[in-house]
Amino acid sequence: VRAARFALIALLTVAIACQSERDQSSATRVGHGAKPAQRIISLIPSATETIVALGAADRLVARTAFDVDSALAHLPSVGEGLTPSLELLTTLQPDLVVAWPDNASRSVITRLERFGARIYTPQVQTLADLRQATRELGDMLGLAESADSLVASIDGELQAVRAAAAGREQPSVFYVVWYDPPTTAGPGTYIDELLQIAGGRNVFGDAPGLWPQVSMEAVVRRQPDVVLISQTEDSPIDVTNLRSAVGWRELRAVKEGRVVQVEADLYNRPGPRVAEAARRLAALLHPSHAERR
């Protein structure tokens, strides 16, 4: 449950920061013209994946408890990204720290700044944000061309998924970020965008907020065609139990077996694997087309 709860808190953390600081470029807080970072600690798993995708895995000097790449397993863990070990962070002497843009991380950021580390706080809620953050990381690592290539590759793959799904029926989807209380992806989030790219329609695409909590009554009224529940290995949900759960049992998608558990580490991380997430979504939403390919 710890990893799944962390994923939700992380999404909400960035959402709040984005709402209050959307007009500020996160890159301005690290300064331009500095030497490429060589000793990096990323407290955000999606940013860590981006650093690896840019070819700079060898510059990472630590990982968090939620970094799943086996290539990083040998690195010391600083704990959870929102509450890392300050002692270990300072001991490792990073020249760049990628941190969560929230008030809870302020003490971490302040202390690291005293030691001369640059701090980068990306605010990624949309695919456009992801492109910007990828390019900003590329600039800080001296890998601008690699970043441009990565963005172009992701965009090309997403466009291929969109083209393949064009013209198909668009099932309505209830994407469950967190099960209890039900929390979903609102309009404008990258999940909302990926659902559209994959040929689906976010059943809460008109909800207020980026990651709103919703009532089961509201879900029942909207009767989504498909329910996708994100989960981690340590937070399994027995889908069969939904058939007797209050509210859930009233959904046709539950009664007719259109509930799918999806990997939170893939879908809830706005990083270089978003195209893979879109492809999997398209296969889930249009299984007959996937089988013919």
Predicted regions and their residues:
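His/Asp/Glu-enriched short active-site or ligand-binding loop at hydrolase and phosphoryl-transfer sites
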Residues: 64, 187-211, 231
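Bacterial N-terminal signal peptides
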Residues: 7-15
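Short secondary-structure boundary segments
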Residues: 44, 101-102, 177, 207, ...
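A short, structured surface patch at a secondary-structure boundary
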Residues: 39-108, 203, 240, 248
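Bacterial signal peptide processing site
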Residues: 18-22
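A ligand-binding cleft/hinge motif common to bilobed small-molecule-binding domains
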Residues: 103-114, 226-243
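Proline-aspartate-enriched helix->loop->beta-strand connector
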Residues: 83-102, 117, 215-232
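Extracytoplasmic substrate-binding proteins
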Residues: 23-24, 32-39, 96, 106-183, ...
